[in-house]
Swiss-Prot record:
Source organism per UniProt: UR2 avian sarcoma virus (UR2SV)
Disulfide bonds: 60-67
CDD domains: RSV-like_HR1-HR2
Cytoplasmic side: 143-174
InterPro entries per the UniProt record, alphabetical: TLV/ENV_coat_polyprotein
Positions in the Extracellular compartment: 1-121
Record's protein name: Envelope glycoprotein
Listed GO biological process terms: fusion of virus membrane with host plasma membrane; symbiont entry into host cell; virion attachment to host cell
Length: 174
């Protein structure tokens, strides 16, 4: 019962984490789009300022801090990380056949028919082992129970005979 509850809790947490990862990815994607549009607007404004300065005969040297302008772009690495995050989210799931997965991992790329065959053989082996372990105990229990029933039955018959003999009235001759 505790294992089933723990499994349900793990499934619930996995579902919750997938939903949170999807929401986070969506939110960060929207923020990246906003940053990209803001970056584009800043670059357009900088180009307009440079154009106006040049139109009035001034260069960037005339105003302190206007010559150096660094606006880094990390959108490509962020997109790669989004893709990686989505791949990890897609890997989250419930394994409905843990024994089959274990066998596939153990024996490599075996076919489904081989997995079913190995699962059947494994089940048969477990049943045989259980019989080998439990059968002697079960036979001893049944044997002792039958012996007790027979002893009780024989003891009851002997007691009955003794009782009848003890209370047997002599026959009257008429």
């Amino acid at each position: 019962v505790a294992a089933a509850q723990a499994l349900r809790e793990i499934e619930r947490l996995a579902c919750w984490s997938v939903k949170q990862a999807n929401l986070t990815t969506s939110l960060l994607g929207d923020l990246l789009d906003d940053v990209t549009s803001i970056r584009h607007a800043v670059l357009q404004n900088r180009a307009a300022i440079d154009f106006l300065l040049l139109a009035h005969g001034h260069g960037c040297e005339d105003i302190a801090g206007m010559c150096c302008f660094n606006l880094s772009d990390h959108s490509e690495s962020i997109q790669k990380k989004f893709q990686l995050m989505k791949e990890h989210v897609n890997k989250i799931g419930v394994d409905s056949d843990p024994i089959g997965s274990w066998l596939r991992g153990l024996f490599g790329g075996i076919g489904e028919w081989a997995v079913h065959l190995l699962k059947g053989l494994l089940l048969g082996l477990v049943v045989i082992l259980l019989l080998v372990v439990c059968l002697p105990c079960l036979l001893q229990f049944v044997s002792s129970s039958i012996r007790k029933m027979i002893d009780n039955s024989l003891g009851y018959r002997e007691e009955r005979k003794k009782f009848q003999e003890a209370y047997k009235q002599p026959e009257r001759v008429v």
